From Swiss-Prot:
This is tRNA (guanine-N(1)-)-methyltransferase. GO terms for cellular component: cytosol. It is an enzyme of class 2 (transferase). It is found in: Cytoplasm. Homodimer. Belongs to the RNA methyltransferase TrmD family. It comes from Rhizobium johnstonii (strain DSM 114642 / LMG 32736 / 3841). NCBIfam families: PRK00026.1, trmD. One of its GO terms (biological process) is tRNA N1-guanine methylation.
Length: 244
């Protein structure tokens, strides 16, 4: 199987691989399970000042990343490439675990890191960029968001986690937030590990974990239950049922 290949187009290539050079992702990169290359967008400017932005048409605050410059950068990285092209943008579709799994199942990804006020809409349309958001907030640039997307993808690539079962009960897998975790000591500051977790009854433990996952999801992310067709206010939905 070919290694997952990530290409990032950015004005700040020195920000990569960042934290992805450490821990699971870093070790996976050393083993050749995935690779990362960066493209300096400014290298594709044609004037002597290496200009990559200009004022917004129609007026307004900030600067806009130029279509011609960015298009040349994209073409250099992916002219005959079928990898998905993502543009990190606060107005994009929210990244979901489902989309992460889809991306991880492919050969790789091309990520464009926006800067300034935005990117010329024409290059978004002409180069088929998929606008992706990691949350309802604005960052100073797309680089931290790109690192977040790659982190989410790389950790679920086959063989990256020591135990491929590790991700099965994580938040958003199965449409629920993850259940609470505990470890030794048994008692800490007067707080005990729930007795069910040390009972040795694995069926009861799984049932408890599922019920806790449903409870936390109902409290913190009722939208996830609504998306799956469950009623956030009722415990009698299918999400609340679990065979021991």
């Amino acid at each position: 199987m070919m290694a997952f290949r990530a290409s990032v187009l950015t004005l700040y290539p020195e920000m990569f691989p960042g934290h992805l050079g450490f821990s699971l992702a870093g070790k996976a990169m050393e083993r050749g399970q995935w690779s990362l290359d960066t493209v300096q967008i400014r290298d594709f400017a044609t004037d002597r000042h290496r200009t990559v932005d200009d004022t917004p048409a129609g007026g307004g605050a900030g600067m806009v990343l130029k279509a011609d410059v960015l298009a040349r950068a994209i073409d250099s990285a992916s002219e005959t490439d079928t990898r998905p092209r993502l543009l990190m943008s606060p107005r994009g579709r929210p990244l979901t675990q489902e989309r992460v799994r889809e991306l991880a199942a492919g050969d790789g990804v091309i990520i464009v890191c926006g800067r300034f006020e935005g990117v010329d809409q024409r290059v978004i349309e002409a180069r088929g960029l998929e606008e992706v958001s990691i949350g309802d907030y604005v960052l100073s640039g797309g680089e931290p968001a790109a690192l977040t997307v790659l982190d989410a993808i790389v950790r679920i690539l086959p063989g990256v986690m020591g135990n491929d079962l590790s991700g099965l009960h994580e938040s958003f897998e199965g449409g629920l937030l993850e259940h609470p975790h505990y470890t030794r000591p048994q008692e800490w500051e007067g707080r005990e590990i729930p007795a069910i977790l040390t009972s040795g009854n694995h069926g009861a433990i799984e049932k408890w974990r599922h019920q806790e996952a449903v409870r936390l999801t109902r409290e913190r992310r009722p939208d996830l239950l609504e998306k799956a067709g469950a009623s956030p206010g009722k415990s009698g939905s299918n999400f609340g049922k679990h065979d021991a």
